[in-house]
Amino acid sequence: MRYAIVFSSKTGNTKLLADTLHDNLPQDACSYFGAPDPAALDADTLYVGFWTDKGTADAAILEFLEQLHGKKVFLFGTAGFGGSEGYFNKILKTVQKSLDRSNTLIGSFMCQGKMPLSVRQRYQAMKKQPIHMPN
């Protein structure tokens, strides 16, 4: 079985998951590791990782998923917000819609990534602002 790990990572969280997969799967069976690329399409099984953008995978991964036909696919992703299983399942369901029916989903995993410092600082600044009630 030849596999590929294809991922997009905006803040490094999804790359950490991709690295963990790579470290725990047979190294000699890995035909591709990296950003979306046609070279990954030679693999029978694809581990596809994404960061969440507006409730779905980022655009680069959605475009890549549409190119898959007759593959075994494992989806993994990170979300900077939320930690509930329901929220993660909703994201995964939305992403799965980009997969052609000829593919077989063999599994999925979602987790909350670390929040970037800039986002955290923005939330902290908002918290210090007085709460304005609607008129």
For the regions a protein language model found, what residue spans apply to each?
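N-terminal beta1-alpha1 ligand-phosphate binding loop
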Residues: 2-24
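Short acidic low-complexity segments
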Residues: 31-42
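FMN-binding flavodoxin-like domain, especially the glycine-rich phosphate-binding loop
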Residues: 3, 23-29, 43-48, 53-135
